[in-house]
Amino acid sequence: MPLAKRIIPCLDIRDGRVVKNVQFHLNTWDAGDPVALAAEYDRQGADEIVFLDINASWEGRSATLDVLSRAAEQVFVPLTIGGGVSAVEHVKAYLRAGADKVSVNTAAVQRPDLIDEIADLFGSSTLVVAIDCKRRPEGGWEVYLHGGRTPTGIDAVAWAEEAARRGAGELLVTSMDADGTRQGYDIALHQALADAVGVPVIASGGAGSPEDILEVLTVGRADAALAASIFHSGRHTVGEVKAFLRERGVLVRS
């Protein structure tokens, strides 16, 4: 029996507030309190919730524990936290504070052995490797670090393969070109990832409608859809998106 597709609201946090950027850097707007929003999305039927401290890696610090611990008291779906995770000690602290999974991005590229260490100590099921990438003019996608500020020259699909091989339980892959545009996911990117790796892929960047989410879960073959603007704006609820998918034959949890 196929696994249910997951709908995952993403809360980008800066200075204790949920914000939303466009293509990682333009037109930031304040979407509210992270704990209140997480609790609301839990009520709406979210399968999981992701907290990303979007400036943590650039500022050389780890993500806030306060938001996580408060959310864990009020939210009853799995929580993932990321942003500035660069050591096993960070992972241990987040799991103790209530996280179910920890997302690692920049530090994993800089020191790939970190993936092996986390997977060995805590299990692959706790580890999400996040990949931010941008289309190359010559084809393919390039990995960027530090919240999209630093190009690496690394091919995103090749890095996804290595991360999965080293022990990532899931991959959270964001198209920087599509991020915040509400113009749809980069379907070709997610098709390429589905062909390349055997671990679940969470698609991120570009959701503007239930149709966009349907497309990335079916045509793009993603295992889960991460979305922010579509929910923060109030245009759609998680429940509405799930009902839309269910009516079109996509298996989702109630």
UniProtKB/Swiss-Prot annotation:
The protein's Enzyme Commission number: 4.3.2.10
Protein name (Swiss-Prot/TrEMBL): Imidazole glycerol phosphate synthase subunit HisF
Keywords: Amino-acid biosynthesis, Cytoplasm, Histidine biosynthesis, Lyase
Upper lineage: Bacteria, Bacillati, Bacillota, Clostridia, Eubacteriales
An MF annotation (GO) of this entry: imidazoleglycerol-phosphate synthase activity
Localization of this protein: Cytoplasm
Family recorded in the similarity comment: Belongs to the HisA/HisF family.
Organism of provenance: Symbiobacterium thermophilum (strain DSM 24528 / JCM 14929 / IAM 14863 / T)
Subunit details: Heterodimer of HisH and HisF.
